[in-house]
């Protein structure tokens, strides 16, 4: 997937899930099956997972020096997802939402997601196709991923959570 298509898919998938959650009523927003997150918690989790990207992507030199280049061929979208589904799928502590999330916070979280997506899109434009395939970032479950692979995964990620919400309601 080319850079332009990749960022568009990333943005579109996040906006689709945000729109879905925004359409939920208070009962649906706060409902969770035992041991699962509410739709509100899913929304906050999505924000927590994208929030670091504008800052880190803006630091290309830091990425190169700290994490280096990948020493294997870039994984396809399918390979990224296959490898992801083999992990625990358990969110690390820094990405776990608050226990209780009031519907009053929904609009604020959505606004923050929107502004974060805009910032990510702007910074992403500074990357070449080659940099997307060579520069790496650490993923808590998959280890080093190229930036392209990270965005493959992060494009899928909100859809995974939307599916969880839909199954749970």
Model regions and ranges:
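Extreme N-terminal tail/first-helix region
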Residues: 1-15
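A short small-residue
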Residues: 27, 93-101, 137-141
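N-terminal leader/capping segments at the start of a protein or of a new domain
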Residues: 21-25
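Short, helix-capping/interhelical loops that line the mouth of catalytic, cofactor-
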Residues: 1-5, 55-112
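Short, contiguous alpha-helical
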Residues: 28-84, 125-169
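Hydrophobic packing residues in well-ordered alpha-helices of helical domains and bundles
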Residues: 10, 39, 109-113, 151-154
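Active-site oxyanion/phosphate-handling segment shared across diverse enzymes
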Residues: 113-131
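Amphipathic, well-ordered alpha-helical segments in soluble domains
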Residues: 13-20, 49, 116, 157, ...
